[in-house]
Amino acid sequence: MEVEEEVSRWEGYADWRNRAAVKGRHGGMLAASFVLVVEILENLAYLANASNLVLYLREYMHMSPSKSANDVTNFMGTAFLLALLGGFLSDAFFSTFQIFLISASIEFLGLIILTIQARTPSLMPPSCDSPTCEEVSGSKAAMLFVGLYLVALGVGGIKGSLASHGAEQFDESTPKGRKQRSTFFNYFVFCLACGALVAVTFVVWLEDNKGWEWGFGVSTIAIFVSILIFLSGSRFYRNKIPCGSPLTTILKVLLAASVKCCSSGSSSNAVASMSVSPSNHCVSKGKKEVESQGELEKPRQEEALPPRAQLTNSLKVLNGAADEKPVHRLLECTVQQVEDVKIVLKMLPIFACTIMLNCCLAQLSTFSVQQAASMNTKIGSLKIPPASLPIFPVVFIMILAPIYDHLIIPFARKATKTETGVTHLQRIGVGLVLSILAMAVAALVEIKRKGVAKDSGLLDSKETLPVTFLWIALQYLFLGSADLFTLAGLLEYFFTEAPSSMRSLATSLSWASLAMGYYLSSVIVSIVNSITGSSGNTPWLRGKSINRYKLDYFYWLMCVLSAANFLHYLFWAMRYKYRSTGSRS
């Protein structure tokens, strides 16, 4: 009887009370559905402010267009980069369940600070209608940035844990579980879009018509409700027990390999037969932790032996780390640890190739919003706030995600006779191609917008240009589609390909790519202004009015860089070999 009860338990997983997770009671689509609802509210809370933040900084904090754009990209970049911290802590010391609760509480605190500042005139710079206004400074600026970066810290932790927490609910040892997990990632992006839809319509309307205290207030309520909903699903979750620092494993293998290369000893005495998978160590560790709680009275009588790991020929320079006689016992590495580090290193070029796409996405939150603000934003008698422009890609994602999951993927599975239908890397590649097209469209639209401004004699005027903002929607549609293909593909790619002890950290690379894209955008803007502003010339992206910017040149540059990046991606993608079940084409 005890053996049957043991078999029904999820190895390496515990419930929220640190008791053994039980099959049929914990995990599955029901548990993951709580995560999907939470993602709607979490992204609503974040994007409601991020999408419109450039206008808040410019009009209420009186920052220049270029400074406000850079501050927004730095804020969003920091938020996504901190996902690495959330992913690391989820793998090493805490569960994804715990990291979400801690991070959501931090974001909640940051939003409270921003709400208080927005509703208190004495905490903001004086209102001003002239072209030159007093920029926020001193304690007021400190309060602004403390609030913003507390939000960034909270968002980072959530991004680094929530998607992994949902994906952990599925049994990857069965085809059904893997298909459900793939569906989860598609609908995770769908729910992200649902939250964005409310954010860029209702909340942005509140910010523009009722005041920013209303916008921050709604975000505060949304993140608070998300915590309550997440907690309500606690009894259904299976929580992966942390296995120790994945960075320690990576650094140990790299250091051991370096020492071996520098020594005169041969690496031929590495033995595979003595090594076992870190994930199995993790399971053993998890079982000991649960047993210490008195939940597991006896270990399994007949434990299946893990498959023996074998050194592969790829990245052979690391094979020396699996030496049976290391220089120091602290540098002792198993063969499986060496192979796990190889997997992570092989994924890094794919990760790097997605940064440029996210650099293009950064333009949606900065220059594109400012372009739309100069155009006619009326549709009939309805006036659309410029920050609501993302509604176009958001709605497209909400339409395309179910079609992709229920029509395209089943057809692709039948056509290719594979479990995935479309491989993760193929999906990412489609997104990269769409980003190239988006930048070309953006350049053509900007040529038209500036032509209207010149013909109307409004190059230096703040008056609305007689051209509809729907032209800007074209680039949003292309970039929105690119985001759907790339983000969902990246999340699933990193989760399925990464070693089980490093999955949260690996999945957070999807968000770190976004972060580096935003930072790269700031760097490119600075470099472009520095080069084009030399010899007394006017920089491309600086001037009294955005109508004087050479944004069309900038977008063409982004198009060329994106095309070069795609060729770089093809080089690595065509040489990549999948390791996980269900990922092979």
Swiss-Prot record:
The keyword Transmembrane helix applies. One of its GO terms (biological process) is response to nematode. Belongs to the major facilitator superfamily. Proton-dependent oligopeptide transporter (POT/PTR) (TC 2.A.17) family. It is a multi-pass membrane protein. It comes from Arabidopsis thaliana (Mouse-ear cress). It is found in: Cell membrane. GO terms for cellular component: plasma membrane. The chain crosses the membrane at residues 28-48, 75-95, 96-116, 142-162, 184-204, 211-231, 343-363, 391-411, 428-448, 465-485, 508-528, 554-574. Gene3D superfamilies: MFS general substrate transporter like domains. The keyword Amino-acid biosynthesis does not apply. InterPro entries: MFS_trans_sf, POT_fam. Expressed in root hairs and in epidermis of both root tips and mature regions of roots. Detected in shoots, stems, flowers, siliques and imbibed seeds. Expressed in vascular tissues in cotyledons, trus leaves, hypocotyls, roots and inflorescence stems. Induction: Not regulated by nitrate. Down-regulated upon nematode infection. Low-affinity proton-dependent nitrate transporter. Involved in constitutive nitrate uptake. Not involved in histidine or dipeptides transport. Involved in (+)-abscisic acid (ABA) transport, but not in gibberellin, indole-3-acetic acid or jasmonic acid import. Mediates cellular ABA uptake. Nitrate does not compete with abscisic acid as a substrate of NPF4.6. It holds the Pfam family PTR2. This is Protein NRT1/ PTR FAMILY 4.6. CDD domains: MFS_NPF4. Its main location: membrane. GO terms for molecular function: abscisic acid transmembrane transporter activity; symporter activity.
